[in-house]
Amino acid sequence: MPFTLGQRWISDTESELGLGTVVAMDARTVTLLFPSTGENRLYARSDSPVTRVMFNPGDTITSHEGWQLHIDEVKEENGLLVYVGTRLDTEETNVTLREVLLDSKLVFSKPQDRLFAGQIDRMDRFALRYRARKFQSEQYRMPYSGLRGQRTNLIPHQLNIAHDVGRRHAPRVLLADEVGLGKTIEAGMILHQQLLSGAAERVLIIVPETLQHQWLVEMLRRFNLRFALFDDERYTEAQHDAYNPFETEQLVICSLDFARRNKQRLEHLCDAEWDLLVVDEAHHLVWSTDAPSREYMAIEQLAERVPGVLLLTATPEQLGMESHFARLRLLDPNRFHDFEQFVEEQKNYRPVADAVAMLLAGNKLSNDELNRLGDLIGEQDIEPLLQAANSDRDDAQAARDELVSMLMDRHGTSRVLFRNTRNGVKGFPKRELHTVKLPLPTQYQTAIKVSGIMGARKSAEDRARDMLYPEQIYQEFEGDTGTWWNFDPRVEWLMGYLTSHRSQKVLVICAKATTALQLEQVLREREGIRAAVFHEGMSIIERDRAAAWFAEEDTGAQVLLCSEIGSEGRNFQFASNLVMFDLPFNPDLLEQRIGRLDRIGQAHDIQIHVPYLEKTAQSVLVRWYHEGLDAFEHTCPTGRAIYDSAYASLINYLAAPEETDGFDDLIKSCREQHEALKAQLEQGRDRLLEIHSNGGEKAQQLAQSIEEQDDDTNLIAFAMNLFDIVGINQDDRGDNLIVLTPSDHMLVPDFPGLPEDGCTITFERDVALSREDAQFITWEHPLIRNGLDLILSGDTGSSTISLLKNKALPVGTLLVELVYVVEAQAPKQLQLNRFLPPTPVRMLLDKNGNNLAAQVEFETFNRQLSAVNRHTGSKLVNAVQQDVYAILQLGETQIEQSARALIDNARREADEKLSGELSRLEALRAVNPNIRDDELAAIDSNRQQVLESLNQAGWRLDALRLIVVTHQ
């Protein structure tokens, strides 16, 4: 190699040393000093792993003094390069900069600079980079972004609500689905979309204290959202790190009590600039015109400051009109400010609901009915649509659907309230109750007697709670020596049931964790029954493992023993047998227990087994739940109201189960109350709202489209390629499960989202739903998104050299493959990627500038190429640098047309879509006051900013590959 003192070279193997200077040489060796690190390297002159650094006109370089020069001309004097150009800080022209004075900390970021500096990547990394660009761009443009990555069944009504609300600016809605229909999942889907698109970055979830862990688990397991749980201890700890502790985390969960009981804490919450507020169990916020509760006022303060609000609540009919109005008032106080006016409005919606029922029935409409429809819709030129809807023509159904849609748009609360009922949603199993009456052992009888004497001063409620769990009473007297499981007939019955149903999965729920642990030991030691335990003393990871073991079909646990609190937020639809070893104290907890199996998507009828001891509180409660509320075999929306009204009487019967006088009358009265309330609820059903919330055929198509996207084989191929190149070990465990573990030779020390001890993944939704320890990998999973960012945010794969063996072309023929990226810079909230994501434009140029990309598809071409080692590659680049530079110049002139076309299309699409949305909502505003002014203003502002950002869009070279033809 021709070396001269003062020349600048870069090491092919140690590029982190920066720019080296030739400081000494003899006949066989050359010494380079690397000023940025102060290190010297001695190389053999004949075959040294270094590359000469040469810049070209158009490049910008930095001097050792820090000023920059835009190169206009390159000269050579005595073997040294001299750059002539314009100094950027002073705008002085014809400034010269000798290469010896270049900044030694030079970083080559442009692909062409890296190529010319000998920083040549492996060929497979270039291919990965191109695929990453291509797939990322496609995913940004895919419909239903944000709805595909969650670990949930694809349930149409949930997807419909999430798709509608998740795309809105700062959504403010009330989710009021009946129990078991998945309000938490709907809220999670909305959050996931908003966070993924950048519409929201900071989220606060406020829930009752008992549901905090349930939300934490659901958000992490289903949506890969890592929330921080704030309690008194965490709040105090965070005060050391920031004036406002809530600014230390982006995603926060706290309890309503935690938020309410401290004035400064509430102020900190209000000042933390959240984008979205989620409030679960919002029906517990008590409000009246004269005296709103402190809890309600706390949420009201937050709702005034946070742009987006999701309230999750029980069904409106259960709560009464005033309570329902109070929720809506939190969402839009300007719209819902007068309760009397609201009541009047609700009455006026009845004709609208009747009209929709008429249209959906499909019968011919009378003239009066047609006139009524015309009056309700109140639009000009509606006559042809009405005639079409009432005809036998092929378009009659489409016309009816259009009329239903127009009526829904005029429905008072359809934009702010979503409510699905079990009647309107298919897919629920039946419930079958099997009660097993068992004798009360003498040991328990004695313990109960003694307890009654000693606890005479206890309240009726405390005695009632004690009587529900006789094993606890016995254990208290006997201490550690008490072995209640040796004589309790429920244990014998359970062992008999499990041994006679060994092929079936059984979920056993009991109130206390200690009971679950003791039962596990008995089942294992006496009958060798494989039982997993699940209780609140376990970590989330331990619970995951227990759930995964229970889910395994062949080698897994037959039974899962859960405590009351431990089972919150977990669903086990793959099992259909539920054993209640004891009974919970109120109907809400009973429904929660059954709800572990009775979920939409359950494939079998649920068998509910209740072994109970006679002459105990259990025998009282089993009758009251079944005969008084019908709560075992059907969901019981009336349960809480009747429980509250019958509480005093019920407690007395539970505290003294032997006193049965009048109990039959109580059951009869509760049953009558239940039937009356149920009829009242049914009559008050808002069928129009249910149709709107359910989504009908549109929601079915949405679920089907996402299911089709689940079968994308590109994802699996790309993910495995990514893991290979990053250096992540993959161990195929069968059953569509793969274990990923970090290796010692990864591209980065820590791959974001991959735990130190690894993780189990699956690409199959069904597997992910039955195996909670397996992460469900989609294009939206953090492992894939982080992998894309890792490759594309750096220079991995941005420059490479390949050989093309092709005897039809002359040896030494050059081709240059260029990958440009067309993109626009804008704040994430604008969601510019909907219209112009970073889009790759591939060109394959010969020396004359002919673009062969259309004729030669990337993957086919890539398979024909072979790799070149870095050292040989550097020599090749040095030999053809001027030719490559000339082809690059031709590429620069050609890219503009393609890029401009992409940008113009994006502008047109953005303008049409955003202007159309604005026009539709403005027109609707005239007939539906629930469309907020701030929402319209935000859409208009968003449209202007999007179009302005697209005007500023540009393009840049992202990667290049030099291809040299060979015949060997």
Swiss-Prot record:
BP terms from Gene Ontology: regulation of DNA-templated transcription
First-level EC class: hydrolase
Record-given protein name: RNA polymerase-associated protein RapA
Pfam families: Helicase_C, RapA_C, SNF2-rel_dom, Tudor_1_RapA, Tudor_RapA
Residues annotated for ATP binding in this entry: D177, E178, V179, G180, L181, G182, K183, T184
Matching SUPFAM superfamilies: P-loop containing nucleoside triphosphate hydrolases (SSF52540)
UniProt short sequence motif DEAH box, positions renumbered to this chain: 280-283
Assembly mode: Interacts with the RNAP. Has a higher affinity for the core RNAP than for the holoenzyme. Its ATPase activity is stimulated by binding to RNAP.
